[in-house]
Design a protein with these regions (language model features):
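Interhelical loop and helix-boundary elements at the membrane-water interface
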Residues: 2-7, 22-64, 76-189, 194, ...
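N-terminal signal-anchor transmembrane alpha helix
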Residues: 68-72
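Phosphate-handling active-site elements
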Residues: 196-199
Length: 251
C-alpha cells in the first residue's frame, strides 16, 4: 500500500500545479475554461494509470474509496473561504470555474464527486464477485476519454445542439450531437481495447449495448453531473453483458 500513498501524493501535487498553471492561462491569456477544465479532466483520469506503471498496487473497493475521499478533500481546498486567502488555490480554481456555472461551480463539482465515487465503489465490488474487475475500464475509458472530448469538441465543432437542465437551477444549458458522438465512439473503442478480457459473445453484446447506453446517459444527465450517470449506466450494462453472456454459455 506504500505505493498507493506515494501515488496519491504525486497526483495531488501534479494536479494542483497543473490547475494553477491552467488558471493563470485563463486569467492572463484568455484561454477558455471549457478547455482547461477538460485538460484537468484527462489528467485526473489518466495520470493515476500512468503512475501505476511505476508505482503498482492492487486496486479495489478500498483504494477507490480512499482515493475518492482524498480528491473530495482536495476540492475542499478551493471553497471560497480558503481560496480567498490563498492565491494558489484561487488561481487553481480559475481553471475549472466556467462563467456559465457560477455561482454553482463548487456545488455541482463536489456533489458530482460525492455521487460518482460510491457508484464506482459499488460497481467495482460487484465486478469483483465475477472476478472481472478489469472490465471497469470500459466505463473509465468512456468517462475519461469520451466525456473528456465531448465538451471541447462541442465547443469547437458543435453545430447541432440540444438542451439540458442542471441541478438546483432553472437555467437551460446545451450539449451537441457532435460532442455526444465522442461518447459513442469511445464506447466502441473501449470495448475493443478490452476485447481480450471478454468472450466473443460478451464482446458482441458489449458493442451492441454499452456505447448506446452510455451515450444516452451522457445526453440525459444534468449539466456537469454526467459522471455519476456514466458510471452507473456503464457499470450496470457491463454486468448485464456478463449475465446475458452466461445464459448463452449455459444454453
Amino acid at each position: 500500500m506504500t505505493n498507493f500513498w506515494i501515488l496519491e501524493l504525486i497526483k495531488f501535487v501534479v494536479l494542483l500545479l497543473l490547475a494553477y498553471g491552467l488558471g493563470r492561462a485563463v486569467q492572463h491569456a484568455g484561454i477558455k475554461v471549457n478547455y482547461t477544465r477538460k485538460i484537468i479532466h484527462f489528467a485526473l483520469f489518466f495520470l493515476p494509470e500512468y503512475l501505476k506503471t511505476f508505482l503498482p498496487y492492487k486496486a479495489g473497493f478500498g483504494t477507490i474509496l480512499v482515493s475518492g475521499t482524498l480528491f473530495l478533500l482536495t476540492i475542499a481546498l478551493m471553497v471560497k473561504p480558503i481560496r480567498s486567502r490563498f492565491s494558489l488555490f484561487n488561481t487553481a480554481f480559475a481553471s475549472i470555474d466556467r462563467p456559465e456555472d457560477r455561482p454553482h461551480t463548487m456545488l455541482w463539482l463536489s456533489t458530482q464527486v460525492m455521487a460518482t465515487f460510491p457508484i464506482l465503489c459499488l460497481i467495482v465490488y460487484l465486478l469483483e464477485q465475477y472476478d472481472r474487475t478489469i472490465l471497469i475500464f470500459i466505463t473509465v475509458i468512456v468517462a475519461g476519454l469520451g466525456d473528456g472530448l465531448a465538451e471541447p469538441v462541442g465547443v469547437r465543432f458543435g453545430r447541432h445542439k440540444y438542451a439540458t437542465r442542471a441541478l438546483f437551477s432553472d437555467r437551460k444549458y446545451t450539449r451537441s450531437y457532435e460532442g455526444s458522438a465522442c461518447v459513442f465512439f469511445s464506447g466502441i473503442f473501449a470495448c475493443l481495447i478490452l476485447k481480450g478480457e471478454m468472450s466473443t459473445i460478451e464482446l458482441i453484446l458489449a458493442l451492441s449495448i454499452i456505447p448506446v447506453a452510455m451515450t444516452l446517459a451522457e445526453a440525459f444527465s444534468p449539466h456537469t453531473w454526467d459522471s455519476p450517470f456514466l458510471y452507473l449506466v456503464g457499470g450496470t450494462t457491463t454486468i448485464m453483458v456478463i449475465e446475458i453472456a452466461s445464459l448463452f454459455a449455459i444454453g
